[in-house]
Structures are given as structure tokens and as C-alpha cells.
Amino acid sequence: MTQRIGLLTLPLHSNYGGIIQIAALSAFVRALGLQPVLLRKEHQKAGWKRMVIEVLKRLPGQNIANYRNQYLKLQRHAAFMEAFLPEQSRVSRSPAELRMECDRLGLDAVVVGSDQVWRLDYIDDGAYDAYFLSFLVGSPIRRVSYAASFGTDRWPDASRVEDVSRLLAGFQAVSVREDSGQKLCADRFGRSDAVHVLDPTLLVDRSFHEEVIATLAPGRGESGLYAYVLDRSAAKKAIIDAAGQSENLSKITIAEPENDLAGYVDLGEWVRRFRDAEFVVTDSYHGMIFSIIFEKQFVAIGNAGRGLTRFKSLLAQLGLEDRLVEVGNERVQLPGAQIDYSRVNRRIAELRMKSRAFLSDALDVEARS
């Protein structure tokens, strides 16, 4: 009988990287001959608040607290989710509801990750411990983390260290996305065996992302310089302009602001823009990853507010530290040398082999008997 593997990540909203990374993880789990199931965890809120939010999502002519736009953006990913996401559970909001879903679905293991699932300010809704799989304490269901990220290089709440340490002690296998997370696991939570692995978007082959484009956005897109910048500023615009001049690219496409619903594209088009660009400037972690996947010359602008550690960790693994520029420096120096992707791809292949071996071994339920 095919083993059923629950996947727990942050709630699916309009974040491109958050959606495509769980699809990639699902694809790899399926390639192992296992059956992935997406565990739908939403933030805990009082019943009346949930009712108000549902009304705001569907009520045209307003965008109070951005609920309407977020809802409409997620609708644009319907075709992607239908094609690339696995079977989904019912929505759960508490650890108790998640436990009931795991039992109902007959899961053999639960994998938490990837993305910033262990970043406390992202998960502290009164049930942060769900992302440390508290709902599986006392259950025979196997507990694994894959490329879980703390988002920063420190844990902000000393009062919860003991609780998190106790929960992580019950995991059969722990892996994290950043080297700083590996250090946190060892120094703060007693898991010196935590493994540093690749983001799921790098775990799968490039062919997975080409399939996304072929399914949702076939054909060719814009060439030239593509700027995918989440947090805009005059300093970042200066970097974009400098990159355009340096690369002698007069054609510059700047992605629409995140709050611009009219210009919000589906995932197929989003991925295609990286594939078809000649040069990329981005302050997005997954924007940086897709620049690497499609072998683009790029500049990554440090995004401290959204988590700078993850940029530095991956770039260091690949020997691409010089591609990171940080706004605030008196003078930004753009990298001069071209990226040697034959070397980078060899390194990715090594890390991919290690990451695949970790997850394959972690999900080998037969090994428990």
C-alpha cells in the first residue's frame, strides 16, 4: 500500500515562492513513489473574525485590510494548484484539528517545510507549536522537517526554547534551509544532527519548472532586464538603472507592485519571466533562486526585513556571495565577473544529491519496522 505523506507549510496566499515550493516538494515526494497530501493550516481567529474576513474577500468595490486583493490573487493560481498541488486536507486551525485530519487521512508521516515555517512572528497565532508538529506527540506518525527556515539567525523568545526543544526531540529527522538554522538547532534546541538542505524549488530538476511554463504560459516572454522587487525604493531603482547600463540593456521590465492587482500574473508567467530574461535584479529569495535555476546573470538586493540570512546562506553554498548587494551602503558596487554556471550547477548537483538522500531516508517508513 502506498505510504501517505502529509506536507505542512505556511498558509497559501499570494506568495509565489510559498506556493511553488510546496508544489515542488510534493512532486519530489510523488517521485519517491509516495502519496503527498497537503495539510491546510490556517491561522487561528475567532469565529466572528473569520466570518467578517470571508465577507471582505468576496465583497467587490473595497479592499479593507487587503483581504479582497489577496483572495483575488490566489484565485489566479487556481490552474496551477489544480495541475501541480496534491490532494488537500480540510482546513485546520488548531493542533487538535490537525491531529484529527492526520488520523482521518491515514498518514504515515508528516513533513513540515519548507519556507519560513519556524519564523515565530509568522506563526505566532496562539498555535505556533503546530509547526513543530505538537499534534503528533504520542502518535506513531513519523515526524520530519524538510528545509524548514527560522527566517533569521536567532530565536526571539527564550521562554519557548524548552517547549520547542521537547517537540524537536520527537522528530525522526530534522533538516533546515539555512546554515544559521542548523546552528540554532544545535545550540538552542539540542538537535546537533540537523541537516542543511536545498529549498524544494532546487530539489527538483529544472524540467519541473519548464513544465509549469509549458502548462500555464507557453511561448516566449520579454527579454532584456527583469526587475522583480518586492519593496521599492529610490535606492533600489538606482541599482536597477545601474545594472541596465552595465549590461547595456535598454529594455527593462519592472514587475508591478505586489498591491497592484491588475498587473499580478499567474505562476506560469512569473516563472517564465525569469527564464526569458537576460539579466535579473531582485530582492526576493525565490526570485534569486529562479535566476539561478535558469542560469541568469543577476543581482540580489539584500532584504533584511524579509530575512537576509536565507540570501547569504544559499549564495555562500554556491560561491556566489558577490551577487548580493545591500541597500544602505554609501556606494553600491555591482559584481563585475560573469557567473560560471558550469561550476554552480556542479555544486547544485552535489547539494541536490545530499538533499534528496536526506528526504528519501527520512521517509523510509519501512526502516522503522
Where is each model-derived feature located?
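Active-site anion-handling motifs in enzyme catalytic cores
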Residues: 1-369
